[in-house]
Amino acid sequence: MKKIILTIATVLLNMALTNAQTNEKEVKFGGRIMYDIAAWGAGEFDYTGSEFRRVRFYSSGKMYGTVKYKLQLDFSGGKISFKDVWMELNKLPIQGNLRVGHFKEPLRLEALNSSKYITFMERGLPIAMSPERNTGAMYHTNFGKKLFIQSGIFRKSDDFGNDKNANNNISITSRATFLAINKGNKLLHLGVANSKRKNNNKTYSFSSRAENHLGNKLISINKEEVNYVNIFSGEVAYVNGPISLQAEALKTTINKVPDIERSFIINHEIISYYGQISYFLTGETKSYKSSLSGFGRIKPKNNYGENGWGAFELAARFSAIDMQENGSLEDVTVGLNWYLNPNTRIMFNYVKGEMANELGEITIENAVMMRVQLDF
């Protein structure tokens, strides 16, 4: 494993040293490092820990004006895994673009937003219900500067983008977003998405922490005899100068195989959602990249060390997962982000998670966390 990591790191370094931009080719190289420290527990902070949450390197580019690519590898946890490994053909009919490879399915604004730019250290609780990267093909297009459509077919894959199983677990995921306002420092983003996921292995399971990646899983569910899973989501984001609001809701329907004795289909529904608010004390505004990427880099008005202290952002969020008779989890998160410059950020989060099991018994977990983040 060490030899593999060293080899890949050497290749990526060589790519960095040979970055080039010509009339035919544009090549970029970059990466990110995120180091987390946390203390958490039920009532008191009984546990402490630290980890490199993400250590990634990537290369992306464009060739001859019609072909794009991205290669991104993650080295956190002492192992290598594929993140984005895709190729894309542009300038197809209806202003279309065809992407093939291993990448995020087009579902949910927060899930599509890069971890470099999310407001809190961890995404809200609905991430446990959201498919992220899988292997497949996606067609995406836009109609003017307001309406954006994405649709793809995917297969569940391993950490290297491979799907060698014969169970034919195929998903179709589609999303539409509308940029109702995008003028000056004001923005209103609206979106809906759907993902229908065939389950030939007849099982469905998930688990979730209380938005503390170092903490323990607090809730889980495991369903047998599942035919397919259907996810419907709605999303909204509003920016007005230094203030921003964002919310999403998901309805996950687990469709079970018809009961032989009762001869009807049994559905189980899970509702998950979050709402958040943030405010820049130093007057900056969130920047919007695109429908597929969400929000982008924050550029402080004055960088730290350059006659300034950077940018400071206060944020709060409430999120929940309701599994009906199987229990629920609710989180309250407050955060302070310090942007020293456009590429360096220090984050402070406090999370209070409240879990109710199927018997109604309550467990509360508190966590304080800090992240030091650098991307290049």
Give the positions of each predicted feature.
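Bacterial Sec-dependent N-terminal signal peptides
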Residues: M1-N23
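Intrinsically disordered, low-complexity segments enriched in glycine/proline and serine/threonine
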Residues: I5-L6, K28, K251
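Active-site-proximal flexible loops/turns
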Residues: A9, R108-L109, N255, A356
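Generic structural signal for beta-strand residues in well-ordered domains
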Residues: T10-L13, S50, N307, N337
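Residue-level signature of transmembrane alpha-helix interfaces in integral membrane proteins
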Residues: T18-N19, Y117, G161, V257, ...
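Outer membrane beta-barrel
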Residues: T22-D159, K164-N200, V236, Y274-E284, ...
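Outer-membrane beta-barrel pore domains
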Residues: G43-F45, L89, S205-F376
